[in-house]
């Protein structure tokens, strides 16, 4: 957290899974407590792991204790291993997304002023006045990421920040997902968002997580190595917004071009890349 803030990063995120990681709520609150301006959020909370009214209370508390620095990332859930290990039914994508849509309504209702009631297929809330209320009224910025048409359309209508993801319908990251990370696939995903958002598109912050980062003077060799590892063509790695490969100067140019093409102004890199990527952050902050 200290490193991120000192090097100019604006937000620290972490996943919400049951594998080898810290629990996001206490970990992110610790990060907020030792920093001043760094924003915090999960990428993303899975709606199926907690009742949304319980999650809303935790998130509102985080926003209060961090003095309004929370980003509310939430999704329908996709990683099948989480569900299998915890004995949570891995329902069809339709059911999980339906439940997520209801969960988002519950979270917004719990954070809004006054009591609210809700009756859906998955959740029923009766005259509940959620407390505390978040500092960022009526709700912290909502981040929804998706790879398929339905979730991207929901994100376009409901989110402040829309994340463009690979398509994870298989429940794992594999060849099928890699095929949806091409520049052409991202063109199609952004078009879905633009059409579903309508007039509000210009108010949305577009987000992408760069999973493949290699800061090197030999961009071609690095891209070839990544392509070989993934079983894809080098050109795909060079053009995909999910990859950042090359020297600092090239990464700056690539990010500016991707902002122009897709609108990406919010780019996430992994913890291992924080130090090497810092000059790129310094060059682009405020631009």
Question: What label would you give each PLM region?
Answer:
Residues 1-287:
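Active-site-adjacent structural elements that line small-molecule/cofactor binding pockets in enzymes
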């Amino acid at each position: 957290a200290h490193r991120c803030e000192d090097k100019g990063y604006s937000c620290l995120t972490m996943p919400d899974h049951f594998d080898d990681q810290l629990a996001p709520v206490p970990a992110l609150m610790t990060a907020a407590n030792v920093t001043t301006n760094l924003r915090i959020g999960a990428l993303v909370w899975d709606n199926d792991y907690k009742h949304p009214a319980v999650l809303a209370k935790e998130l509102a508390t985080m926003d209060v204790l961090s003095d309004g620095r929370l980003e509310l990332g939430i999704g329908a859930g996709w990683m099948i291993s989480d569900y299998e290990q915890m004995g949570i039914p891995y329902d069809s994508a339709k059911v999980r997304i339906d439940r997520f849509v209801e969960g988002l309504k519950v979270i917004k209702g719990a954070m809004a002023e006054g009591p609210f009631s809700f009756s859906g297929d998955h959740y029923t809330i009766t005259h509940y006045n959620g407390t505390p209320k978040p500092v960022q009224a009526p709700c912290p910025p909502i981040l929804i990421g998706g790879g398929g048409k339905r979730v991207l359309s929901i994100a376009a209508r409901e989110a402040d920040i829309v994340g463009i993801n690979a398509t994870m319908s298989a429940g794992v990251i594999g060849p099928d997902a890699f095929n949806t990370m091409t520049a052409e696939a991202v063109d199609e995903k952004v078009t879905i968002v633009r059409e579903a958002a309508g007039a509000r598109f210009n108010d949305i912050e577009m987000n992408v997580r760069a999973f493949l980062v290699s800061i090197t003077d030999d961009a071609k060799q690095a891209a070839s190595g990544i392509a070989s590892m993934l079983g894809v063509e080098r050109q795909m790695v060079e053009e995909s917004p999910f990859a950042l490969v090359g020297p600092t100067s090239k990464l700056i140019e690539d990010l500016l071009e991707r902002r122009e093409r897709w609108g990406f102004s919010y780019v996430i890199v992994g913890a291992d890349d924080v130090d090497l990527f810092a000059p790129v952050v310094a060059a682009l902050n405020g631009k």
